[in-house]
Amino acid sequence: MKTSLFKSLYFQVLTAIAIGILLGHYYPELGAQMKPLGDAFVKLIKMIIAPVIFCTVVTGIAGMESMKAVGRTGAVALLYFEIVSTIALINGLIIVNVVQPGAGMNVDPATLDAQAVAVYAAQAKEQGIIAFLMDVIPGSVIGAFASGNILQVLLFAVLFGFALHRLGSKGQLIFNVIESFSQVIFGIINMIMRLAPIGAFGAMAFTIGKYGVGSLVQLGQLIICFYITCILFVVVVLGTIARVTGFSIFKFIRYIREELLIVLGTSSSESALPRMLDKMEKLGCRKSVVGLVIPTGYSFNLDGTSIYLTMAAVFIAQATNSHMDIFHQITLLVVLLLSSKGAAGVTGSGFIVLAATISAVGHLPVAGLALILGIDRFMSEARALTNLVGNGVATVVVAKWVKELDHQKLDDVLNNRAPDGKTHEISS
């Protein structure tokens, strides 16, 4: 029992995070130097994301009986994303207005370091809904894979899958090759995941060593408020959706606990993407649904980021005494409904989208971003964790709506009853 515990990835990552926190706290300079370990692990994961998405989507679509089913899955997924993302935005807006973490700070925007956020503001100006949509189309297929742009790879994979499906029996050889290649890729993922504890240790040691636990105190109320809001969203909103769909959110969280710990250590939900594709399929969701919903959700279903954006924007208004009436807040909500969809496609995602939103709304001081800059790194864990759980729940929900969910397998796996390799008929 003890041997299996020590060998489990869950235990190893949790231990690594704890050691990283201790090193960063007691030896901050040494902790800050551990950054390359975390960066290297995230780069290894990003290296494999594009081929994983390509193989999963192509084999999923090409193996389907009807192309109408693919279109239906995509439409249902986008509808779900829009509804739940809107709920997340409203959830953050309500709680930040009730708690008012920025009230009483009385910060003069003129005293803030505008230069500290100048780079983010400049990047934000380059972002827009048209630019985001145009960026989905790659300049070249090789460029899409080289840059690791999830949506570009997804677009090419969908088109490739459609074309391969139309070939019928003539395309069977290509299908078999891609499926075999997919098995090799997942073998590589298993090897990379053995390094997860080292990556989590390096990233956590760097965060605590560079920013220090003390930097949390001044703006701690916002951080605590944000974390509680994310927990409430997962338990109440996603929990209700899960219950209606037929499973327990707590059992689901236990099922993906290793992926959650990897995300906690690296602060990047992308670091768990390859494993989530595999795990959601093992949970009973058909491969074609998993291949469409998970990658698309990384740009269109960022629940944690949505909560962060509304809370951070209103916090800046409260801290700088910038009045926001109901009209201003509705305007903020509408702008965020559009701008939040590009969050995963931008380097520094959440913070840059926040800068773009504040610039677009107009009546909030852009310099107020400096208040958030110092603590943004500590809020990224809650964002990433909520995003991951949200995308996992979305996959199960969409799979059920389009009748591509194996309910018996879902129940068996979440209750630890299904032996490896056991399959069931897909229910309708």
UniProtKB/Swiss-Prot annotation:
Q: Name one GO cellular component term.
A: plasma membrane
Keywords per UniProt: Cell inner membrane, Cell membrane, Membrane, Symport, Transmembrane, Transmembrane helix, Transport
* TM stretches of this protein: 5-27, 47-64, 77-99, 141-163, 184-206, 216-238, 289-311, 326-348, 353-375
- Gene Ontology biological process terms from the UniProt entry: L-aspartate transmembrane transport
Q: How does it sit in the membrane?
A: Multi-pass membrane protein
Superkingdom assignment: Bacteria
The molecular function terms of the Gene Ontology recorded here are: fumarate transmembrane transporter activity; malate:proton symporter activity; succinate transmembrane transporter activity
The subcellular localization recorded is: Cell inner membrane
Query: Its biological function?
Result: Responsible for the transport of dicarboxylates such as succinate, fumarate, and malate from the periplasm across the membrane.
Q: What PANTHER family does the record tag this protein with?
A: AEROBIC C4-DICARBOXYLATE TRANSPORT PROTEIN, PROTON/GLUTAMATE-ASPARTATE SYMPORTER
Q: Which family does it belong to?
A: Belongs to the dicarboxylate/amino acid:cation symporter (DAACS) (TC 2.A.23) family.
- HAMAP family in UniProt: C4_dicarb_transport
**NCBIfam families hit by this protein:** PRK01663.1, PRK13027.1
Which protein, by its recorded name, is this? Aerobic C4-dicarboxylate transport protein
Q: Which organism was this protein described from?
A: Salmonella typhi
Lineage runs: Bacteria, Pseudomonadati, Pseudomonadota, Gammaproteobacteria, Enterobacterales
